[in-house]
């Protein structure tokens, strides 16, 4: 999904902007950095319970924590990493609002991606490092230093 498709999916959900944060690939997609296959959200417990009661399919994450799924959207109470945790309150307070949607900040997203170690996360870390260097005004270099 490109940024417009992700935004359309999120707008259709009509979630309270102060109760969730877009994380993962969808946060990159909305910023126009790459496409994504799904939309991961971290939400406050009251919204999680409301969506669960509304019939969202329950799932269990690799760390044993509960999640919800409907279509392309997956809902969590936290991120799937113990070593780089952030509370939902912290995520909401530090979210970057784009197109009316709260996105995880790039530094936090990069920290999570570094802990996962999957091939797609390694590619995302390289992308995020370039974007953050550019944002800081530093010269852009490839991962091999050129």
Task: Label every PLM stretch briefly.
Residues 1-146:
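Compositionally biased terminal segments of proteins
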């Amino acid at each position: 999904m490109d940024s417009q498709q992700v935004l359309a999916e999120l707008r259709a959900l009509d979630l309270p902007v102060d109760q969730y944060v877009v994380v993962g690939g969808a946060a990159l997609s909305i910023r126009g950095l790459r496409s994504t296959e799904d939309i991961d959200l971290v939400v406050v417990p009251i919204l999680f319970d409301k969506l669960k009661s509304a019939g969202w399919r329950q799932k269990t994450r690799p760390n044993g924590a509960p999640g919800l799924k409907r279509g392309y959207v997956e809902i969590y109470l936290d991120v799937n990493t113990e070593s780089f945790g952030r509370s939902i309150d912290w995520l909401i307070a530090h979210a970057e609002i784009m197109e009316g949607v709260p996105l995880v900040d790039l530094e936090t997203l990069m920290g999570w991606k570094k802990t996962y170690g999957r091939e797609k996360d390694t590619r995302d870390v390289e992308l995020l490092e370039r974007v953050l260097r550019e944002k800081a005004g530093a010269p852009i270099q490839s991962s091999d230093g050129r």
